[in-house]
Amino acid sequence: MRSRRMKTVGVIGLGNMGRGMAGSLRRGGYTVLGYDAAPGVALALAGQAVLSARDSVATIARDADVLLLSLPTSAVVEAVVLGAGGVLENARPGCIVIDTTTADPDSTRRVAAALAERGIGFVDGPVSGGPKGAATATMTMVLGGSDSDIAAIEPILAVISAKRVHVGPVGAGHTTKLLNNLLTGVHLLAASEAVRTARAAGVDPEKLVEALNGGSGRNSATLTNYPTWIFNGKFDSGFTMKLMRKDVRLALGLLDQFDSVAPVAREAARVWAASEVSVADGEDFNRIVDFVDPA
């Protein structure tokens, strides 16, 4: 049982998502500690009174009741948690780690098992909603973990997200998130093909999307991506091609692991991988439309 109040939250990874969640936690009345591998990032946020900066994983792990990870890959999570001077060596028994990274479920289960041996809890809680959702606490979180760990951190989750779905044990959150992002990739490719065909047929693409959004053909790309980031040319979702390709690749690994035929998903994965020749990793992930529909 974890009976002590969890009032100090350490955020490891202060990029677009991490800094937004740190701000939400601060506004929610929590003591927020922050660490980022990039020099100066935590100190800059400390200067804005968002958090108290820490200079290493070890120091933030020792001082926090809950650790919230917002990192790019499973490899980075493993290094931060299991590596020398990491969370495993320094967090106190009773601490709970919340991993919001979109990560490999097998890696997640390995990390959670190692932490459990030290009496440290783990919940995989990947998020949807982008940097704006992180900054405004309107994200959705899909949670994998024990009922007791999730109950213990529910007050914290409530100040950083608007909706939470507990989908199963450790690893289930990351499995669900990968499938979500795979579908996002499929939707965006399908919508861009429809837009390309409409343009060729003399139909205004914006009118097409307006019509689709009133019918059964609507999807996340027509409802959000095209109106918010593509038609206006902003391409500033805060989510890069590199991250999307990584997520699609991990989702493809899930399909392989369970011998799923999935011809549509596999073709979508092939297109996302092939786009690397002309759309750079650092570009917004919505730039995939330039590969599919080079208008």
Language model feature labels by segment:
Residues 170, 174, 183, 219, ...:
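Interdomain hinge/lid region at the active-site interface
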Residues 2-70, 100, 131:
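NAD(P)+-binding Rossmann beta1-loop-alpha1 motif at the extreme N-terminus of oxidoreductases
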Residues 9, 14, 102-182:
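Rossmann-fold dinucleotide-binding core
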Residues 57-69, 74-119:
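Rossmann-fold NAD(P) dinucleotide-binding segment
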Residues 32, 53, 122-123, 164, ...:
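Hydrophobic beta-strand scaffold residues
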Residues 136-137, 141-144, 165, 169-201, ...:
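Active-site-proximal catalytic alpha-helix in oxidoreductases
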